[in-house]
Amino acid sequence: MLNVNFVNEESSTNQGLVVFIDEQLKLDSNLIGLDQQHHGLISKTIQNKLQFTGKYGQIKVIPSVIKSGEVRYLIIAGLGNEEKLTEAKIEELGGKILQHATGCKISTIGLKLTNRISRFTSQTFASLVASGAFLASYRFDKYRTTLKEAEKFAVESIEIFTDNSTETAKLFEIKKLIAEAVFFTRDISNEPSNIKTPQVYAERIVDRLEPLGVDVDVIGEREMKNLGMGALLGVGQGSQNESKLVVMEYKGGSKDAPTIALVGKGVIFDTGGISLKPSSDMHLMRYDMGGSAAVVGTIIAVAGQKLPINIVGVVGLVENMPSGNAQRPGDVVTTMSGQTAEVLNTDAEGRLVLADAVWYAQEKFKPKCVIDVATLTGAITIALGNTYAGCFSNNDELADKLIKVGEEVNEKLWRMPLHDEYDAMINSDIADMANIGNVPRAAGSCIAAHFIKRFIKDGVDWAHLDIAGVANSNKASALGPKGAVGYGVRLLEKFIKEYT
């Protein structure tokens, strides 16, 4: 794991030294001495716009001209226009710095802060850069037995020179705790589905959360049957692995304080069931539990900080498998709410899991607000691509707050419509509703949201986040490698912290 340290005095023991330059290409007063020490290497570089323009995110790694000393490389990082810098951009810049240092096999890095930024304190700037670097240090390679030497290399430490190391370290400790929650979400999402069975996943939740003071209850199929959870159980009935409902309760607030419920879809592997998916990308369905992982990660972050709020998480863990005992297209299931659903397509299974999970959360905990998170529909990816998750809500204020926070942490949300005409499209001839719409390929993500909405009680504020397009990525980003992104943890943690 990357070591991050904050020190008041500059050290010369790091192999790489990072300096920040904005698009005005002017040396900070605190860089003049360093530039002279390195025989004008920094000033010569920024005077040549073919080499360096100062635009945001540009990283220039230059071998040091000093024969003696530990510093082998100067790393010049572009800030761009200071007025356009955001916290998210500063974090991503930290990630880019770490990635370039890794590529150049620089094992220890020192960061010299700029004094040209007025919109952020030096402590905030330093903690954000460190947070981005820490997030970018994540790896999931435990099943690789033949890593090449270049693939094994990792930056060992980052040392940031700041005038208030104690205060900066406190800020970073919170960000590190949140990043470690993101790492749990990434880890469990990346885990192969033959390893993370519902039972194993549930055990990992217990092991991670109980030491943080979170009450965790793992409900098996017998109890779910007694509760009337026919929708969730129907999805998992084709699998040899027993379905689980994991209930997490963190009581940090007063007894009369309102409760927020987070509900996550945890389809451990989704073949589509009898309505079988195409085989080409089916291996990616190990990520179909990304919503549940985001819920668990959020509770790790909240409980780890001991925030004074009451929050519950409910995740339905199932496998959607074809077998002689699998659910059939045309089956009718009775949900915990008593409403019935005709299963016209067994590959529209996530909404069935959520139907019972959100109802359970409302019945048991009487929350003021329910936010469900799910890799629910391919339709949302067609609509929004891999940049935005879809946000559906019955409350404008709730939706606006989520969208605002999403912009701030760069986990973006786009408000999607709810409408009575969409709701009418899930009416069934033989049951209370069908799990797909009656117009083929029309408004798929909206239809799915309306299915869940039928299980939200009157007076409960509700938001549904369809994260199918953003939960995993086929390419690396500034904050992590390809694979599971950990989307939703930082969004929900900040939403809960700021608005409850």
Swiss-Prot record:
Q: Which reaction does it catalyse?
A: Release of an N-terminal amino acid, Xaa-|-Yaa-, in which Xaa is preferably Leu, but may be other amino acids including Pro although not Arg or Lys, and Yaa may be Pro. Amino acid amides and methyl esters are also readily hydrolyzed, but rates on arylamides are exceedingly low; Release of an N-terminal amino acid, preferentially leucine, but not glutamic or aspartic acids
Q: Which UniProt keywords apply?
A: Aminopeptidase, Cytoplasm, Hydrolase, Manganese, Metal-binding, Protease
Query: What processes does the entry annotate via GO biological process terms?
Result: proteolysis
Q: Which residues cross the membrane?
A: none
The residues annotated as the active site are 277, 351
* Cofactor: binding details: Binds 2 manganese ions per subunit.
Any idea of its EC number? 3.4.11.1, 3.4.11.10
Protein's job: Presumably involved in the processing and regular turnover of intracellular proteins. Catalyzes the removal of unsubstituted N-terminal amino acids from various peptides.
Alphabetical list of HAMAP family matching this protein: Cytosol_peptidase_M17
Q: What is this protein called?
A: Probable cytosol aminopeptidase
